[in-house]
UniProtKB/Swiss-Prot annotation:
Family under the similarity heading: Belongs to the complex I 23 kDa subunit family.
Keywords of this entry: 4Fe-4S, Cell membrane, Iron, Iron-sulfur, Membrane, Metal-binding, NAD, Quinone, Repeat, Translocase, Ubiquinone
Binding locations of [4Fe-4S] cluster 1: C54, C57, C60, C109
The protein's name: NADH-quinone oxidoreductase subunit I 1
Organism: Symbiobacterium thermophilum (strain DSM 24528 / JCM 14929 / IAM 14863 / T)
One Gene Ontology term, aspect cellular component: plasma membrane
Length: 162
């Protein structure tokens, strides 16, 4: 009698789940929404006037627990500036093979130039293409970033309603 009850219980569970809406989606044609705080591909932001927000402080490199970020700073040329500061990120490299997408680099950035986007489709055929150089990271189409008044404007983090 004990075995019959177990089979009946299992069949009841099967029938209950059978008529539910399926959890799977027809990806890539139908995409599920991501969480608002999802962290994906890295992006370096620029100001509206084209200057890079990165001042080459290397704090993102220091904060990265996986050592996935490499930054080399160079002195800024006053005649042809790259950023509003004295220095700029001459070489900026993110190794997506090492990155754990924790967001510590984003939090460490004093100018708020480093941003983790919602982009998550990062698969590729070669390992070299997953090491992103500065040219691949810089977003030349800024939206809402004003011309800097000074090198380190007082950025404030907004609280996210959880």
């Amino acid at each position: 009698m004990n075995g019959v009850a177990a089979i009946a219980k299992g069949m009841a569970t099967t029938l209950k789940v059978l008529f539910r809406k399926p959890v799977t989606v027809d990806y890539p044609y139908v995409k599920r929404p991501r969480a608002p705080r999802f962290r994906g591909r890295h992006e370096l932001r620029t100001y509206e006037n084209g200057l890079e927000m990165c001042v080459g402080c290397e704090l993102c490199q220091v904060a990265c627990p996986a050592a996935a970020i490499t930054v080399q700073a160079a002195e800024n040329d006053p005649d042809n500036p790259h950023s509003p500061g004295e220095r700029y990120g001459y070489k900026y490299q993110v190794d997506l093979l090492r990155c754990i997408f924790c967001g510590m680099c984003e939090e460490a950035c004093p100018t708020d130039c480093l941003h983790l986007t919602q982009e998550f489709e990062l698969a590729d055929f070669t390992r070299e293409s997953l090491i992103l150089q500065k040219e691949q990271l810089v977003n030349r189409n800024p939206s809402g970033f004003k011309v800097p008044m000074n090198v380190y404007p007082p950025f404030r983090r907004k609280a996210v309603n959880a």
